[in-house]
Amino acid sequence: MTFSLPSGDLQTTCVNIMDGFFYMLGIFLVGFASVIISGLTYSFFYVILPMIQRANPHNPLWVSLHISFVAFLLINVLSNYFLCISAKHKGPLYDKVIRELAEATGFCHPETPQDVLQYKKDFEDRMIFRIQRRQARRVEARQEQQQVASSNSAETSGVTQRKTNGESTASNPANSTSIPQPQQKKPAMPVRRWLIMGPHEWGFCDTSHQPKPPRSHFDHVTKQLVLNMDHYCPWMFNTVGYFNYRYFCNFLLFTVIGMTYGASLTWYPFSAVRSKEYHDQITLSREQHSDEILHMYDYVPIPRERTAIAFSFLLCISVGLAVSVLFGFHTYLLLTAQTTIEFHGNCANRRRAKKMNKKYKNPYDLGMKRNFQQVYGSGNPLLAIIIPSNREPEFLPLPIPGKEGFRPRNVGKKGQEEDALVPNIV
C-alpha cells in the first residue's frame, strides 16, 4: 500500500481551517481568562479577605498589606494582559523600526514595487544557489560513504566453497553479502530558508510580498509579518513578538506570583473542609438554632464558602504549575536571546555542529545582562518589571553589540556594552 501527500489545494484548505480555528479559539480563551481572573478576585475579596480580617481583628496593617498586594498583582496582570493583546505588529511604528533596522544593518530597503520585485528575484537566486550547493555537498558525502562501504564489503566478502560428494558448490547467493540490496531513495526534506541564511541577513516573505527582516516570520493566524516572532498565543489572541514580548513575560511572572500567593492562602481552608473543626461549626450552629452557619475557627470555611475555596485552590495549583513551566522556559529564552522558533533551529544547528566536532554559539547572544536589556531596556530592571508601561522598545529587534544596537533616539543612553559576537556555523 502506498501513501501520497494531499494536493496543494487540499493542504492550503486544511491550513486555512486550522488558522480559523485558532483565531476563534483565541476569542474564547480571552473570555475564559477574564472569567478566571474575575472568579479569583471575587473569591479573595468576598471569602478569603473576611477570613483574614476575622483572624487578625487587632492588626489592620496586616489586612491592608494583603489588599495592597492583591491590588498590585491585579494591576500588573490586567495591564500587561491588555498591552499584550492590543500590541500591533504593523503600522507606523513597525515601519519606523524596519527603516531603523535596515539602516543599522546596511540594508538598502526597496521602496518602489519595481525595487521589491528585483530584490525578490535576487534573493530567490541566492537561495537556489545555496540549496543546490547544500544538496551537492550531501550527494558527495553520500557517495564517499558508499565507496567506503563497498570497499569494506569487497575485502570481507567472498565465495564460500562447499564440497559435497566430491563436487564444489557455491554458497547461496541470497546469503552473500557481496550483492547489494536495493535501497529505497528517501524523499528530500524541504529546507527552511531562514536556517541557511546569515544571522543578520534579510530575506523575502512570499506571503506578504515584502522584505523579511532578520528573526521575523509570517504568522498565518494574524496574517502579519512579525518581528522577532516567538509564537501565536491564543490566550493572548495575538502573536508574541518584538512589540509585546515584555508584556507577555511580565504577565507570566505576575500570574505565577499570584497563583502561588492564592494557593498559599487557600490550602489550609481547603484542607480544613474535612476537618473536625469544620463539622463542629455546623453542629454548634444548629444547636444554637442559628439561621446561618457561624464561623468559630480561624481559616475554617463554612459550607457556602466551600465551593469558592475549592475553586480557588485547585485553579491556583493547576494554572500555577502550568504557567510556571512556561515562565521558566521563556526566562531561559530571554536570557539566552532566543525565540521559541530560534530555539528549535539552534538545537538543529548544535546537532549539526557536533557531527563536525565543532561548537555552535547563538549569534544573537550578547550575554545575560544585555539580553535582558534587549527586552526590558537599559533602565532599572526592577522598575521595568513592576511598573506597567507601554513605552517603545529601546533596542533594535536584531541584537547588535555596542551603541549600534540602540534605536536612533536612544543612542548615548546608559547601557552600551561592547560584547562581541561569535560567528555561528552557516
Language-model region placement:
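Membrane-associated feature with strongest affinity for ZDHHC
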Residues: 2-426
